[in-house]
């Protein structure tokens, strides 16, 4: 009984994490990048700047994919 309850709670926690993450992204993302970075055409070379679960421009990246412009240091979730 305890293991089933723990498993159910774990499942709910994971589902809640993804729902919150998707809700955050739907407000900011358009065409897979943040709106505030869409107009930036300088330094288009990107590098990874986030580990899974880290924040990127104050937004949690669901899968840890975060791109940065080298010159400006501005990041966006991919």
From Swiss-Prot:
Tree of life domain: Eukaryota
Propeptide residues according to the Swiss-Prot or TrEMBL record: 24-47
Disulphide bond pairs: 49-62, 56-66, 61-77
Keywords for this protein: Disulfide bond, Ion channel impairing toxin, Knottin, Potassium channel impairing toxin, Secreted, Signal, Toxin, Voltage-gated potassium channel impairing toxin
GO cellular component: extracellular region
Expression (tissue specificity): Expressed by the venom gland.
Record protein name field: Hainantoxin-XX.2
Domain characteristics, as noted in the entry: The presence of a 'disulfide through disulfide knot' structurally defines this protein as a knottin.
Similarity-based family: Belongs to the hainantoxin family. 20 subfamily.
The species this protein was found in: Cyriopagopus hainanus
Subcellular location: Secreted
Leader sequence segment: 1-23
GO molecular function: potassium channel regulator activity; toxin activity
Known function: Moderately inhibits Kv1.1/KCNA1 and Kv1.2/KCNA2 and weakly inhibits Kv1.3/KCNA3, and Kv2.1/KCNB1 voltage-gated potassium channels.
């Amino acid at each position: 009984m305890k293991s089933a309850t723990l498993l159910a709670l774990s499942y709910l926690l994971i589902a809640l994490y993804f729902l919150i993450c998707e809700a955050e992204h739907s407000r900011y993302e358009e065409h897979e990048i943040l709106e505030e970075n869409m107009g930036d055409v300088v330094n288009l070379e990107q590098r990874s700047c986030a580990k899974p679960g880290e924040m990127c421009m104050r937004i949690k990246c669901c899968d840890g994919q975060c791109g940065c412009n080298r010159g400006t240091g501005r990041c966006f979730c991919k």
